[in-house]
């Protein structure tokens, strides 16, 4: 593990290649969020195809939900791919900017990461330039000055401060999205349940129409349980470092943060844009 001071972290994080990496990571996570919405939409259309007229041919009535379930699987795969890349890019950023086990990446892995960052940035140059110029205090929020320090810190203290900022932001964003997710989930289940109650469809049609959305709900439940478990481990690891600020505990906490980023539980980008400046100011004043 490299020993990085807060001054070194502040300078290193704003090097062009790291700004592009953070921008690419944000684009990947935002793309994952959008693909996840499309997957939900496909599942919902499949579920509500139960309203198709009885007079239609059986092939059409059963084929439409099957088709949309297949489309949902494609969007799910695209979601997972972008979550992977977003987490991978952030993992590289932290490893090299904070200085926690940067040697874990081979030369070929590093080349792939830099190529990915350049490809994403080149595809969105205007938005990319705005993002790398703006900080979290600006509108729209950018990726410059990703980590901020109110006082100079050395070694493990500086690294742990970066980790605390990651944990703090994640909790604040989670608190804002939970009510929306719960309301949306209950609404979907209630609407579909009511529809099933009032309609009389064959078992085959019912299974075809409901399978996609049921699997999607179980997938979301599974991912959120994983997310909660890792979050509890992160909180415990954070408390350990507050008592024993040692390198081995910082490395363990970072591995948990990297693991959580790879779980398909995403921020809501629309909320992040609205509250980023406010939360950035709040952390600066309270830290």
How should these model regions be labeled?
Residues 29-83, 175-230:
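Alpha-helical transmembrane segments and their immediate juxtamembrane boundary regions
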Residues 2-32, 77-172, 176-177, 233-287:
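Conserved non-transmembrane functional hotspots
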